[in-house]
Each structure stands twice: as structure tokens, then as C-alpha cells.
Design a protein with these regions (language model features):
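Short, well-structured N-terminal submotif of metal-dependent ribonuclease cores
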Residues: 1-42
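Acidic, PIN/NYN-like endoribonuclease modules and their adjacent C-terminal/linker elements
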Residues: 5, 42-43, 109, 116-143
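Acidic active-site catalytic centers that drive phospho-/nucleotidyl reactions
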Residues: 14, 105, 123
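Alpha-helix capping/helix-boundary segments
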Residues: 17-18, 46, 64, 108, ...
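Residues that scaffold the ATP/ADP-binding catalytic core of kinase and kinase-like folds
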Residues: 20-22, 53, 129-130, 142
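Glycine-rich, phosphate-binding/catalytic loops in enzymes
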Residues: 28-31, 58-59, 131, 136-138
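PIN-domain endoribonuclease scaffold, especially VapC-family toxins
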Residues: 34-40, 44-94
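Active-site neighborhoods of divalent-metal-dependent phosphate/nucleic-acid chemistry enzymes
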Residues: 76-118
């Protein structure tokens, strides 16, 4: 048996990680710690989703979300190939873990493929796609 795969040098960060970092969970300090060990990247759509959620729940903390831009790089939608996005939608639609057929995070999976980066998310949607994804707890144990 081979040893477990190491965490990739870059991580694609889901909106729920950004929201958790802003709204006071321990994810904030973890984001800072992990950014010192890995490149953190997200999509425009994920950052916009986080902005919308934080703006609705706690608009006074939007500046905290904006400060995360010092740690996380945003990649534009046009930097991901349309065929990768379509393939990611298909992979998520048939993934057994979530069984809900949701393709809303296909942009993150396609970005991860484009960059050959693992995913960091609290969602189970990526399980079953064949692409590495990490919860915060598992990621901290691995880096």
C-alpha cells in the first residue's frame, strides 16, 4: 500500500470556508496558518457568494472578508475552459456522496482541475468526483 497523497501546493477554497473565517469560527486563524504553507485560490463566483452571505448575515464584517484577499487569490471565470466547467458539472451531477445532483460548485471543481489543486470545503459535494477535497480538520492534520 502506498502512503497517503500529500496535500497539493495550491488549494481551491470554497465560499463556505471564507464565510466561516469571517463569521467567527476557528477557520479564520486556520486560513491564516494554511496560507503560509499553501497557495490559496478561489473563483470569482465563490468570492461573490461569500460576499453575498456575509453582507446578508453580518454586513459590518465585509471588511474582514475583503482583508482575506491578502491571503487568497481570485481567479477570473474566463481563466477556466468551458469544457472543464461542463465536465465538472457532469462529475458533480453523478457524484454519489451528495446525491443531490447540485452543480453549483462546478466552477470550483473545474478551477481545481485547471490548477491541479486540491479543494478545501465544508461541503460533501466533491466526494465521489475522484478529486481530492479536504475539510478543515483533515487539512490541518495533513499540512
Amino acid at each position: 500500500m502506498s502512503p497517503p497523497r500529500a496535500v497539493s501546493a495550491a488549494l481551491v477554497v470554497d465560499a463556505n470556508i471564507l464565510v466561516a473565517a469571517v463569521l467567527g469560527s476557528s477557520t479564520g486563524p486556520h486560513l491564516d496558518l494554511i496560507s503560509g504553507r499553501r497557495s490559496l485560490i478561489t473563483s470569482e463566483a465563490a468570492f461573490e457568494e461569500a460576499y453575498k452571505v456575509v453582507g446578508h448575515v453580518r454586513p459590518s464584517d465585509l471588511f474582514v472578508l475583503e482583508s482575506l484577499l491578502d491571503l487568497v487569490t481570485i481567479i477570473a471565470r474566463e481563466d477556466v475552459a468551458d469544457e472543464d466547467l461542463a465536465a465538472a458539472e457532469t462529475a458533480l451531477r453523478i457524484a454519489p456522496a451528495s446525491r443531490n445532483g447540485s452543480v453549483t460548485d462546478a466552477h470550483l471543481l473545474a478551477l481545481a482541475w485547471t490548477l491541479d489543486a486540491d479543494l478545501w470545503s465544508h461541503d460533501r459535494d466533491f466526494a465521489g468526483t475522484g478529486w481530492p477535497s479536504w475539510s478543515t480538520a483533515n487539512l490541518l492534520a495533513a499540512v
